[in-house]
């Protein structure tokens, strides 16, 4: 490959498993082991039940994502940007590890939001997750918004919520414009994010799928890689510029 193509990287949970963050939908994922756990991140249940909120905050407090460090896959994406290759990251992950690895925040679209912030469902006030977790540690079960008293939630897209249409629109535009679309660590089963791969192919991009399990888009892909992401993604990206 010659030149420096625009590379769009759709990253899913599999990218962060080497950082100790579980793949919730995988064979041993939390949603399969404990279907009741989905209630903790389902908007209707969360808003309607203080006990669900209490348990949800405890889950956030104990989450591996808050203490995780970037792994080789995250660093490989950051290195691609440092080498001057035009790259945009469209991530389904909420852990913020792409940015911690050194990818410019303006190059990352967090399709499902971020677990590093909280937002008030009443007034929209936003702040660091760490501040709310400090209140949990101090003894609050269900800390309300300090501005309006409203219900606080993580700044992620819960089940039952819509993705931000502005973010999704920008992701679609990037998918249409890119020359290479890499889907890595994602089952490509969650819409509308998964459909970005089809958008890219329909607009002439080369599609590369890097995932342990088969995906619905493998037949559309120019290349399918089943090797471990921590070694496969760095090797792939080294060849792109």
UniProtKB/Swiss-Prot annotation:
Cofactor(s) in the UniProt record: Zn(2+)
Function: NAD-dependent protein deacetylase which modulates the activities of several enzymes which are inactive in their acetylated form.
Annotated catalysed reactions: N(6)-acetyl-L-lysyl-[protein] + NAD(+) + H2O = 2''-O-acetyl-ADP-D-ribose + nicotinamide + L-lysyl-[protein]
Protein's name in the database: NAD-dependent protein deacetylase 2
Chief site of localization: cytoplasm
One protein family per Pfam: SIR2
Binding positions (nicotinamide): 94-95
Keywords: Cytoplasm, Metal-binding, NAD, Transferase, Zinc
HAMAP family to which the protein is assigned, alphabetical: Sirtuin_ClassU
InterPro entries with a match to the protein in the record: DHS-like_NAD/FAD-binding_dom, NAD-dep_sirtuin_deacylases, Sirtuin, Sirtuin_cat_small_dom_sf, Sirtuin_class_U, Ssirtuin_cat_dom
Amino acids binding Zn(2+): 120, 123, 145, 148
Domain of life assignment: Bacteria
């Amino acid at each position: 490959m010659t030149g420096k193509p625009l590379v769009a990287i759709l990253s899913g949970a599999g990218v962060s498993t080497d950082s100790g963050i579980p793949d919730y939908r995988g064979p041993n994922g939390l949603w399969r082991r404990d279907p009741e756990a989905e209630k903790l991140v389902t908007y209707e249940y969360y808003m309607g039940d203080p006990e669900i909120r209490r348990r949800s905050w405890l889950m956030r407090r104990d989450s591996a994502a808050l203490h995780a460090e970037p792994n080789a896959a995250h660093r490989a994406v950051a290195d691609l940007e440092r080498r001057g290759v035009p790259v945009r990251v469209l991530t389904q992950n909420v852990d913020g590890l792409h940015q911690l690895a050194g990818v410019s925040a303006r190059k990352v679209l967090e399709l499902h939001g971020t677990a590093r912030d909280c937002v008030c469902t009443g007034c929209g006030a936003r702040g660091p997750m760490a501040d709310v977790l400090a209140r949990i540690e101090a003894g609050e079960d269900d800390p309300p918004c300090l501005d309006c008293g409203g219900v606080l939630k993580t700044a992620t897209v819960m089940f039952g919520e819509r993705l931000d249409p502005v973010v999704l629109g920008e992701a679609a535009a990037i998918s249409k414009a890119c020359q290479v679309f890499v889907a890595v660590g994602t089952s490509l089963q969650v819409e509308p994010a998964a459909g970005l791969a089809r958008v890219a192919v329909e607009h002439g991009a080369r599609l590369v799928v890097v995932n342990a399990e088969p995906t619905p888009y493998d037949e559309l892909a120019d290349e399918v890689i089943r090797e471990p992401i921590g070694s496969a993604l760095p090797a792939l990206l080294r060849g792109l510029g």
